């Protein structure tokens, strides 16, 4: 597709059946920007943000494997997810990548494995490690994440709705953002419970702390000061560990500041993605 657009346009209109096939929607003109969403959701959630970004960028909004219109990879691992996303995004000039939550871990892994392809990173409410441990207090307890996996098989929809509520817990304002997330949750079908459970396993296993100092791309780390899933302390740690990173914290925001605080989020992102 060429030219600017007023809304997202689909490169892959139908749910793909081939393992690893990835759905990408591309819109706008300018330097390329890839958007990577979080667990259990899909790229449709970026909708409110797209007009601002597409005014300055050629935006490629990706449904991560196993989510939205994208098939799961086989095997379903972080490395295979990264490889599938890399294969789906058009080849051209180096990319800016904005990753939220799980998408941030995908973005960091991609930047580490393909440093010539990724020019800069924006990491939103993400963490090098999503479960707490003796040497990492900046995360949820492992038992909490495990309980989500157990509950998926018992009360699938209720568990996902509760997860959405946790993302905006304490956010001010959060009610409108939560309504938007609920509207989009099943807009591209219901993700397979076994795939979401496997994705939780990936989240539980992620530990990118040793890799962070070797991710040299210019990086903007953005956190919500009320985020309980990826606490701001995790973002501050990332910004300090990465060699060319800056940090911004959005007051009153939970885990989805681009929805609850769009103007503050746009200010925090600033001209960073444009290389200025």
Model-identified regions with their sequence ranges:
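Active-site glycine-rich loops that stabilize anionic/oxyanionic intermediates
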Residues: 38-41, 101
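Flexible "cap/lid" loop of the alpha/beta hydrolase fold
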Residues: 112-113, 117-154, 195
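Active-site loop/oxyanion-hole signature of alpha/beta-hydrolase fold enzymes
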Residues: 27, 47-51, 60-98, 112, ...
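Alpha/beta-hydrolase fold catalytic core
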Residues: 1-33, 51-58, 83-94, 248, ...
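Catalytic histidine-centered segment of alpha/beta-hydrolase-like enzymes
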Residues: 253-266
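Gly/Ala-rich beta-loop-alpha elbow adjacent to hydrolase catalytic centers
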Residues: 99-103, 107
């Amino acid at each position: 597709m060429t030219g600017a657009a007023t809304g997202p346009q689909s490169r892959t209109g139908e749910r793909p059946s081939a393992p690893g096939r990835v759905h990408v929607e591309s819109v706008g003109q300018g330097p390329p920007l890839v958007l990577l969403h979080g667990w259990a959701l899909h790229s449709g959630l970026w909708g409110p943000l797209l007009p601002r970004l597409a005014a300055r960028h050629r935006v490629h909004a990706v449904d991560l494997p196993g989510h939205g219109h994208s098939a799961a990879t086989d095997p379903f691992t972080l490395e295979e997810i990264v490889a599938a996303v890399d294969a789906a995004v058009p080849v051209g000039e180096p990319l800016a990548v904005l990753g939220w939550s799980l998408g941030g871990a995908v973005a960091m892994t991609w930047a580490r494995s393909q440093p010539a392809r990724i020019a800069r990173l924006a990491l939103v409410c993400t963490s090098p490690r999503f479960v707490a441990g003796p040497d990492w207090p900046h995360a949820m307890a492992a038992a909490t994440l495990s309980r989500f996996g157990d509950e998926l098989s018992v009360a699938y929809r209720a568990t996902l709705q509760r997860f959405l509520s946790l993302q905006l817990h304490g956010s001010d304002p959060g009610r409108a953002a939560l309504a938007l997330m609920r509207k989009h949750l099943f807009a591209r079908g219901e993700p397979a419970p076994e795939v979401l459970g496997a994705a939780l396993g990936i989240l539980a296993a992620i530990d990118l702390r040793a890799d962070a100092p070797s991710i040299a791309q210019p990086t903007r780390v953005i956190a919500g000061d009320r985020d309980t899933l990826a606490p701001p302390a995790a973002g501050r740690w990332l910004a300090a560990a990465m060699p060319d990173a800056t940090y911004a914290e959005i007051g009153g925001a939970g885990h989805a500041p681009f929805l609850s605080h769009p103007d503050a989020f746009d200010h925090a992102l600033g001209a960073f993605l444009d290389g200025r």
